[in-house]
Amino acid sequence: MDFKKDRINMVDGQTAKKTVFATGIGNAMEWFDFGVYAYTTAYIGANFFSPVQNPEIQQIFTFAALAIAFLLRPIGGIVFGIIGDKYGRKVVLTTTIILMALSTLTIGVLPNYDMIGLWAPALLLLARILQGFSTGGEYAGAMTYIAEISPDKKRNSLGSGLEIGTLSGYIAASIMIALLSFFLSDAQMEAWGWRIPFILGLFLGLFGLYLRRKLEESPIYENDVETPARDNIGFFTIIRYYFKDILVCFVAVVFFNVTNYTVTAYLPTYLGQIVKIDETTTSVLITCVMAVMIPLALFFGKLADKIGEKKVFLIGTGGLTLLSIVAFSLLNTKSLPFIILGVFILGFFLSTYEATMPGSLPTMFFTHIRYRTLAVTFNISVSLFGGTTPLVNSWLVESTGNIYAPAYYLTAISIIGFIVIAVLHVSTAGKSLKGSYPNVDNKKDLEFYESNPKKALWWIKVKKNKNA
């Protein structure tokens, strides 16, 4: 392969940061919706599953609606992944945010069971399915886009900005529910108050659409657009040649999302039902821990750019292997300072994943197959192990009677993650994306790669004997 110096991408760092903000808005909206849903499960259950008298069973049905929607994410990943690889990243990102906004609004205006009977839970499920389908393309597309527009040496620190959107969206949801719960009675919340955040989510989506329409296509995608291998590559061919990378990506997404959904979706329920903390205190506690996670994620993102994301992965998986049971033990002391410490331990190690996943997962695949492979792998993993986490944890506690069952589940997942990452993952921090010339933001790096073609195109040796 002839080395062409003019294909090294000079990226403006400030422009990249603005782009991360525009892209992260979609993630903020996704998690605003998810956060509101998690905090209002009791009200949603009472409105859409009212024939079921047991509140705990209502909650399981409500979580089941969420879990079923997650099963649609791989289909969304396939559809939007193929479109994103063939027609560009921008077209997908503008489409998914529209669909997410519409599905969020729909939940807020749906009639309840007393009004339309079985149509109520059926339409709720359809709205969640649309949400799952659109988010199947959203997050993978956002990760891919940010990785492709970021300077290689800042990919993890800028990629962590996507997860800042996650945390900000969830914090906004938590604050809104806390304010509504403070000003409205429980009866008012159940009757109509829970709908307000879902309706307001439409405006967040419109703001995100406004910003995303101004985005430019990623330079790496445009430079690769004439690659003959772009078309007619089947998923079985991709699996055949990139099985190890797909396996590492799959496992990484498992331990990331089991931890993520345990903290963000299941912990509020656990603190309320098991630990017996009131809803307002739970909301404030989770919100404060997530606020602390924002600077932690930024710190670990910068650290990953310096020492490699593999070491940061191992900090997270190793820490949760050792301390998950400790954290849940602290939660069950019933002492608020120890409860805060327990939640903080989980949030601290989750922030290592928040910092590194967006910047590292896209590096596992070559440009012409990156979006679709990442989208399908990510969403199958999320569907099986992420969205089902609240349901699995609720079922484990209900069926075993053991309040530490969620800690055992998290520990087991972390052990598997630690082993797979330690043995199979190769750090790509600071290196160009596979199949692409480097992204640089200064003259020094540009001159270095111009005089060191093998460093610039390090991935050529990886692609030897691979035809996909």
Curated annotation (Swiss-Prot):
The keyword Membrane applies. The keyword Transmembrane helix applies. GO terms for cellular component: plasma membrane. InterPro entries: H+-coupled_symporters, MFS, MFS_dom, MFS_sugar_transport-like, MFS_trans_sf, Sugar_transporter_CS. The chain crosses the membrane at residues 20-42, 63-83, 91-111, 115-135, 164-184, 191-211, 246-266, 284-304, 312-332, 336-356, 376-396, 403-423. Keywords: Cell membrane, Membrane, Symport, Transmembrane, Transmembrane helix, Transport. GO terms for molecular function: symporter activity. It is a multi-pass membrane protein. Its main location: membrane. It comes from the Bacteria. It is found in: Cell membrane. Belongs to the major facilitator superfamily. Metabolite:H+ Symporter (MHS) family (TC 2.A.1.6) family. May be a proton symporter involved in the uptake of osmolytes such as proline and glycine betaine. This is Putative proline/betaine transporter. The lineage of its organism: Bacteria, Bacillati, Bacillota, Bacilli, Bacillales. The gene is proP.
